[in-house]
C-alpha cells in the first residue's frame, strides 16, 4: 500500500495547472448512459474514482476510450442495467447510474454505495424522487431495484434536504421523462450547472440549474455530445491553502474564481494577498502574518464542506484561535486526531472544531481517513518540522491528480513509496 513521505519546513512557490473537477466529471460521465450515441468529454482528470467509473460503464456495456485527457463514451452499446457491488462499493457516486438506467431502459439494479466514510449520506432522497416519477423501487439484499412501465412521468419533487447527488440523479432521470419535472430545494453547486450544460448539449430541455428550482421538460431521446469538464474548485482551493500555510506564493492556472468566491473571501480574511483573473488565481503570503478564520460549512453558495479539512489545517498554523463548524456531514472531523498527533491544538465540541495557537508542529506517521482529510494531513506535513508519513493515500488518489508531482513542482519535499 502506497504512502507519502514528506520532509517538512519547505516554502512553496510557482505555478500549478488545475485539473478537471472530479465532482463534475463523475455525474457527467454517467450521463453518457442516457445518450444513444458517442459523447466526447475533455479535461477529464485521471483519478481513482474516474477509473472506477470507467470500469462500471464498461460493465454496463458502454464503449469507453481514452485519448489524452479526453474520454469518449458510446452509450449505444449499453445492454446491462446491473451496477454490481464490487464496483459500487468503491465509490458512492456509483449510485448516479440509477437515474439514467431507469430513465432510458426502464429498470436498474444498483448496489447500495460505498466511498468515503464521512457520514450516512442515505439514498432515500434519490429513491423518493424516482418514486414520485412513477418508478417502483425496493431495496433488498444490498441492492436498489427500480422498474417503471414505459417512461418515467414528470413530477413536482420537493427534496427534504439539499442533496447534490439526489439533484444530479433526478435531473438526469427527468431528461427522458414524459412531461415536466420540477426539482424544488435543489442543490446549486457549480457542478450541477456543468451537468445541466452537458445534458442540454445532448438535447435536454433544462432551465434553472444553479438555483434551488430546476425545471426539466422531458424529451424522447438524447444524443451524444461534446463537453469540457469545468476546473476543480476544490483542488484550486487546496493549492491556495497550501501556499498560504507555507508562507509562499502560487498561481493556479486553468481555473475559475467564480465557483470559489466563499473560499477566496476567507483566504483574504487570513491576510493573504489574492489576485483573481478570468482563468487564474494568484495568492501571495510571503512576509505576511497568517491569521486564523472562523468557518461554517453550508450548501453552495456557502463555504464548501470539501474545503473544511484544509482550513482546519490552516487554522492550526495560523495566529489566533478560530472555530470550524461542519453543518453538512455529521462525521467529518476524522482528520483532527491525526493533526493532534502532530501537535495541533484542536478540541472538538459537537460539530465544531476549536483551533487554538499551536506552538510547534512535528512530523509524525498519520493515517488518511477520507479524501479531503488526506489533503489536510499532506499540507500540515509540508509545514511541520521533520518527517511526516501519510498512510492510506488511496483516499487522496480518488480526488487529486498527481498531487505529489504538483506539490513537488512548487518546492515541497514529498515522495510516494510503497510501504
UniProtKB/Swiss-Prot annotation:
Highest taxon of source: Bacteria
Swiss-Prot/TrEMBL keywords: Cell cycle, Cell division, Cell shape, Cell wall biogenesis/degradation, Cytoplasm, Peptidoglycan synthesis, Pyruvate, Transferase
Modified residues (2-(S-cysteinyl)pyruvic acid O-phosphothioketal): 116
GO cellular component entries: cytoplasm
Keyword tRNA-binding in record: no
Pfam families tied to this protein: EPSP_synthase
Pathway(s): Cell wall biogenesis; peptidoglycan biosynthesis
Binding site for UDP-N-acetyl-alpha-D-glucosamine: 92, 306, 328
Active-site residues from the entry: 116 (proton donor)
GO annotation (BP), single: regulation of cell shape
Catalytic reactions on record: phosphoenolpyruvate + UDP-N-acetyl-alpha-D-glucosamine = UDP-N-acetyl-3-O-(1-carboxyvinyl)-alpha-D-glucosamine + phosphate
UniProt-listed Gene3D superfamilies: Enolpyruvate transferase domain
Function in brief: Cell wall formation. Adds enolpyruvyl to UDP-N-acetylglucosamine.
Protein name, entry field: UDP-N-acetylglucosamine 1-carboxyvinyltransferase
Amino acid at each position: 500500500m502506497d504512502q507519502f513521505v514528506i520532509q517538512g519546513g519547505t516554502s512553496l512557490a510557482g505555478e500549478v495547472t488545475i485539473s478537471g473537477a472530479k465532482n463534475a466529471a463523475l455525474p457527467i460521465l454517467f450521463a453518457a448512459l442516457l445518450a444513444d450515441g458517442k459523447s466526447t468529454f475533455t479535461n477529464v482528470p485521471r483519478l481513482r474514482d474516474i477509473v472506477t467509473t470507467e470500469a462500471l460503464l464498461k460493465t454496463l456495456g458502454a464503449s469507453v476510450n481514452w485519448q489524452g485527457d479526453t474520454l469518449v463514451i458510446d452509450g449505444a452499446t449499453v445492454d446491462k442495467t446491473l451496477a454490481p457491488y464490487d464496483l459500487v462499493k468503491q465509490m458512492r457516486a456509483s449510485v448516479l447510474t440509477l437515474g439514467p438506467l431507469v430513465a432510458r431502459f426502464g429498470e436498474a439494479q444498483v448496489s447500495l454505495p460505498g466511498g468515503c466514510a464521512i457520514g450516512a449520506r442515505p439514498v432515500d432522497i434519490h429513491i423518493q424522487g424516482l418514486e414520485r416519477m412513477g418508478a417502483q423501487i425496493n431495496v433488498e439484499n444490498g441492492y436498489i431495484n427500480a422498474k417503471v412501465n414505459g417512461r418515467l412521468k414528470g413530477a413536482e419533487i420537493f427534496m427534504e434536504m439539499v442533496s447534490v447527488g439526489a439533484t444530479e440523479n433526478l435531473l438526469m432521470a427527468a431528461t427522458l421523462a414524459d412531461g415536466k419535472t420540477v426539482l424544488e430545494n435543489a442543490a446549486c453547486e457549480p457542478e450541477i450547472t456543468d451537468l445541466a450544460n452537458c445534458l442540454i448539449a445532448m438535447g435536454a430541455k433544462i432551465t434553472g440549474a444553479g438555483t434551488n428550482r430546476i425545471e426539466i421538460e422531458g424529451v424522447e431521446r438524447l444524443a451524444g455530445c461534446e463537453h469540457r469538464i469545468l476546473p476543480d474548485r476544490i483542488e484550486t482551493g487546496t493549492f491556495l491553502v497550501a501556499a498560504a500555510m507555507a508562507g509562499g506564493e502560487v498561481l493556479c492556472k486553468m481555473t475559475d474564481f467564480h465557483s470559489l468566491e466563499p473560499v477566496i473571501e476567507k483566504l483574504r480574511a487570513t491576510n493573504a494577498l489574492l489576485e483573481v483573473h478570468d482563468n487564474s488565481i494568484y495568492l501571495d503570503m510571503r512576509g505576511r502574518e497568517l491569521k486564523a478564520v472562523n468557518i461554517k460549512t453550508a450548501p453552495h453558495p456557502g463555504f464548501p464542506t470539501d474545503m473544511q479539512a484544509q482550513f482546519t489545517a490552516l487554522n492550526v498554523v495560523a495566529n489566533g484561535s478560530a472555530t470550524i463548524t461542519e453543518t453538512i456531514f455529521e462525521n467529518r472531523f476524522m482528520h483532527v486526531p491525526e493533526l493532534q498527533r502532530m501537535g495541533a491544538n484542536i478540541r472538538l465540541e459537537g460539530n465544531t472544531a476549536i483551533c487554538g495557537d499551536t506552538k510547534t508542529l512535528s512530523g509524525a506517521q498519520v493515517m488518511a481517513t477520507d479524501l479531503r482529510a488526506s489533503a489536510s494531513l499532506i499540507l500540515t506535513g509540508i509545514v511541520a518540522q521533520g518527517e511526516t508519513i501519510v498512510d492510506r493515500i488511496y483516499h487522496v488518489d480518488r480526488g487529486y491528480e498527481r498531487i505529489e508531482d504538483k506539490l513537488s513542482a512548487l518546492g515541497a519535499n514529498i515522495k510516494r513509496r510503497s510501504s
